[in-house]
């Protein structure tokens, strides 16, 4: 089997929405199986005014990131679909739908979205280095979305793999001064290994068991603070993608953002994404090696405050 692994039951030609689920990994592996309080003139704290979307939040304002900036921030999407033959990687069909849906979802949250297709390792590093060197003083946060093949700790450019940390560390507090104390969000759709999640039966599942497939630079803070990494899967495992419908993780993320992105805190959003991916998706294939597999996303947060868009 070449390219990504496949997994959706059908016969003959498949429609765009009924194509096989695939994984973002090497073919040879898969074959082996809040706003801050403001000071009044008298020195008393003035609570920030609440919009209709957040007036029912019971949160201490100083524990929320300040989003009261001219811009929400920049969102960079790197969408790698086609790879050089030397990488041994197949075409990531379905990723264009992911990129398009992500662009719409993040624009609706107020981000300035920029999408870059089929970038080499050097291109990705240059692109994000330039972004880190920009002046983000008028922005509340920064987001980056990587859509590609991957392995644990690695993301693939069109010409091969590179360490994810070589991209993310460009935005550390000691390198990107204008994002100090502001949330830096990374969403990564890629495999992190070659294991399959077989899933397990539970007696406490949902009733319907049908499965488808601020910154405040006056304080000294750690350089690694205020990062959030949302991975499509846990370390060591495959990440599934359908060539017609897009990836399980990205489509679930977009769905939750579209419905709750302006009401819920970021960890609430991502917890719901975890639930949707874990309960609503299961791979199906005529090949039993790739059938009835599951997936659970993984969130790694170094955020120091609550984040509401």
Swiss-Prot record:
Regulation: During activation, the N-terminal disordered prodomain is removed by cleavage. Concomitantly, double cleavage gives rise to a large Caspase-7 subunit p20 and a small Caspase-7 subunit p11. The two large and two small subunits then assemble to form the active CASP7 complex. Can be cleaved and activated by different caspases, depending on the context. Cleaved and activated by initiator caspases (CASP8 and/or CASP9), leading to execution phase of apoptosis. Cleavage and maturation by GZMB regulates granzyme-mediated programmed cell death. Cleavage and maturation by CASP1 regulates pyroptosis.
Residues at the catalytic site: 149, 191
Gene3D superfamilies named in the record: 3.40.50.1460
InterPro entries: Caspase-like_dom_sf (IPR029030), Caspase_cys_AS (IPR033139), Caspase_his_AS (IPR016129), Pept_C14 (IPR002398), Pept_C14_caspase (IPR011600), Pept_C14_p10 (IPR002138), Pept_C14_p20 (IPR001309), Pept_C14A (IPR015917)
GO biological process, one term: execution phase of apoptosis
Region: Loop L2, residue numbers: 192-201
Enzyme class, spelled out: hydrolase
Keyword Ribosomal protein: no
Name of this protein: Caspase-7
Species of origin: Gallus gallus (Chicken)
